[in-house]
Amino acid sequence: MQTKNILDFEYSDLQSYLLNELGLEKFRTDQICDWIYKKRVFDFESMTNLSKDDRQKLSDNFKISIPHIVKKEVSKIDGTTKYLLELEDKNTVEAVIIYYPSRTIACISTQVGCPLKCSFCSTGQSGYVRNLSTGEIIGQLLAMEKDKEMDVKNVVYMGMGEPLLNFNNVVQTIEILNHPKMKKLGARHITISTAGIPQKIEEVGDLNKEFRLSVSLHAPTNLQRDQIMPINHKYPVEQVIQSCRIYQKKTKKRVTFEYILIKGFNDSKEDALKLVELFGDLKVMVNLIPVNENPAGFEKPSKRFIQAFLDTLVKNGIDAVVRAEKGSDISAACGQLRTRELKEANR
């Protein structure tokens, strides 16, 4: 009998299966979820408040498939921890634990590789293999939590891949993260990042959930964005912004935009003013990210240019910050996942 990964199941579907297919009482669902998501116990035999018969039924029908930690690197600068995780089919993904003074964040992947091939991002250079299953996405968080012996209260879908191209599985993982009997994370502590898939951004608005949306913009014009983000040929800047307006009208929530600053390319005061004009009356927050080491050889602007860009946005009524760099010494910063793996493979 082929067993199913229990991490693929939302609460209601799991309860229904346990009740109708295995004959387990309803309250057993809560006990099983507590063992997996709260206590991080990943074998049924250790679930001691279940009867031996129930444990056998679970083992016969389910597996708890957690990615194997192949490699772990810890930043000597800030403690950021990057994991190389192996899936059952031997494909690998990377995920990261990031520490801030007020919170700890798990950055998780949604695809093996990425099809978008943004020129400043290492993940896209490794090619695209497939979407991750619901259980494979959730499993990254559980593997890191067990290794760190801690509960992570903030999750960002900013690892490898484009989350909105794996829409159904990503939404299902959010239900699992948010459910009070499963991970019980507050929806506002969950952020989906996207390179800008207009139809899917609007669908996120239709969900009417409290999780946050972050859009990777990185340039104020199509001429610039075309050069660094091939997806812009299909979904130009204006279309992305319009979908964000529709999202905001539906949800009443502010949209966060990620903007990588590249020396001599998109870092001038004129670029900042074009950004202000592009946003118009859209309520936004802009995270400015000085570009990290990347396959295209792009360089960071000087601190003076970064500050001038920030000041121009703020003076024109745009909420903006320069995002603190984390994990750059272990290639765990924005756009760097899979960098070292690629370098080692090419030696």
From Swiss-Prot:
It is an enzyme of class 2 (transferase). Pfam families: Radical_SAM (PF04055), RlmN_N (PF21016). [4Fe-4S] cluster binds at residues 114, 118, 121. SUPFAM superfamilies: Radical SAM enzymes. S-adenosyl-L-methionine binds at residues 161-162, 193, 216-218, 292. The active site is at 94 (proton acceptor), 334 (s-methylcysteine intermediate). HAMAP family: RNA_methyltr_RlmN. Belongs to the radical SAM superfamily. RlmN family. Specifically methylates position 2 of adenine 2503 in 23S rRNA and position 2 of adenine 37 in tRNAs. This is Probable dual-specificity RNA methyltransferase RlmN. The lineage of its organism: Bacteria, Thermotogati, Thermotogota, Thermotogae, Petrotogales.
